[in-house]
Amino acid sequence: MQFIDQAEIQVRAGKGGDGIVAFRREKYVPAGGPAGGNGGPGGSVILRVNPQLQTLLDFHYTQLFKAEDGQRGGPKNMTGAAGNDRIIEVPAGTMVYDTETGALLGDLTDANQTLLVAKGGKGGLGNKFFLSNHNRAPDYALPGLEGEERSLRLELKLLAEVGIIGLPNAGKSTLISVLSAARPKIADYPFTTLVPNLGVVRPPNGDGVVFADIPGLIAGAHQGIGLGHDFLRHIERTRLLIHLIDSTAEDPLRDYVTIQTELEAYGHGLSDRPQIVVLNKIDALLPEDLTDLQARLQSEIHTPVFAISAIARTGLDALLHQIWQELEQLDLATEDASYPGSGAIEGLTPGLLSRGVVE
């Protein structure tokens, strides 16, 4: 299954049923009054979050979604049946835009959250509605109204609290695989990870925290170079970034600056997101070389630098302890510890991701 995080679809609500012209025709009422029923309302198109979905792949096979039309009215003042709504299931984290205007219609983050994107047309009025003192036998009715139709752009942004970033081959996939039960593809060449991977890690006391291994970024990523900004958007909802650096690289400091530059150029506050800087692959360094490198980095970037070997599983306890501390401080700093940018918009009635959980 492909990881698809963008799609365009067309939605069309149902037309309202027509009202009808009818009169009472009973045995002892040969000239009864008007009795034409109203048409039923057309069905609406509604998006609904299915937390089991992880991709927008299905929308690349089906682009047009239509709700049912309402039924025409009936005699004896019977209202026509309403058209059935069309429910479209989307993954959590789906942002919905009006293609024509670019307006954000909704940000769907919660299980079973819904968003009305095309309202069904009203049913037409039957001739009974037009009965008055001046017209005791109206012989006209109104047709149903057309339902709303619009083009939508869907954009999936992963719901992860902790994002693992770094240049290709920094060891991001290895790290998420040892911290969680996720099993991403791992190999010794750049861009092994071509899709984001999710893993759930449980702190000593608390619910699981979702980590996302974001595919390797390179210089110019914000302009679409390499894997490009297609995956930078998935960092936007994170609360904390783990900036992973290959300690065996030619110039680890330059690698750090490269990623920071891309975050700043992309915008959306990514460069200001809380970060934990981590040197990986320290099992390949001599102790004195590691000490020198760690000290040089800390003096240049003015922040603590953690040292780990994901493959040897060393230094992970200290790193996790720091992660839990950072998240706890973020919780205390805000009354609402939800993902940045999540929530409904006021006034408006993805190969497969790897997932794992570890205790």
UniProtKB/Swiss-Prot annotation:
Source species, domain of life: Bacteria
Gene Ontology biological-process entries: ribosome biogenesis
InterPro entries: G_OBG, GTP-bd, GTP-bd_Obg/CgtA, GTP1_OBG_dom, GTP1_OBG_dom_sf, OBG_GTPase, P-loop_NTPase
Annotated Obg domain residues: 1-159
Keyword vocabulary terms for this entry: Cytoplasm, GTP-binding, Hydrolase, Magnesium, Metal-binding, Nucleotide-binding
CDD domains reported for this sequence: Obg
Chain ranges of the OBG-type G domain: 160-328
Pfam families assigned: GTP1_OBG (PF01018), MMR_HSR1 (PF01926)
GO CC, any one term: cytoplasm
Cofactor: Mg(2+)
Entries under HAMAP family matching the protein: GTPase_Obg
Family (UniProt): Belongs to the TRAFAC class OBG-HflX-like GTPase superfamily. OBG GTPase family.
Assembly and oligomerization: Monomer.
Official protein name in the record: GTPase Obg
Biological source species: Cyanothece sp. (strain PCC 7425 / ATCC 29141)
